[in-house]
C-alpha cells in the first residue's frame, strides 16, 4: 500500500507513516 489511507495492524495509517 503506497500513498494510501490504509491502516496497518497496530500501526498508524500509512498515509502518515509513508507519505508519497
From Swiss-Prot:
> What GO MF terms are annotated?
serine-type peptidase activity
- Tell me which Gene Ontology terms the entry assigns under biological process: collagen catabolic process; proteolysis
Q: Which reaction does it catalyse?
A: Hydrolysis of proteins, with broad specificity for peptide bonds. Native collagen is cleaved about 75% of the length of the molecule from the N-terminus. Low activity on small molecule substrates of both trypsin and chymotrypsin
Provide the Peptidase S1 domain boundaries: 1-20
**EC code(s) of this entry:** 3.4.21.32
Establish whether keyword Protease is in the entry: yes
Extract the ranges annotated as region (Disordered): 1-20
The answer to whether UniProt assigns keyword Protease to this entry is yes
**Name of the top EC class for this enzyme:** hydrolase
Q: What does this protein do?
A: This enzyme is a serine protease capable of degrading the native triple helix of collagen.
The entry assigns this protein to a family as follows:
Belongs to the peptidase S1 family.
Name under which the protein is recorded: Collagenolytic protease 36 kDa B
Amino acid at each position: 500500500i503506497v500513498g494510501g489511507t490504509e491502516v496497518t495492524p497496530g500501526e498508524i495509517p500509512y498515509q502518515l507513516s509513508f507519505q508519497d
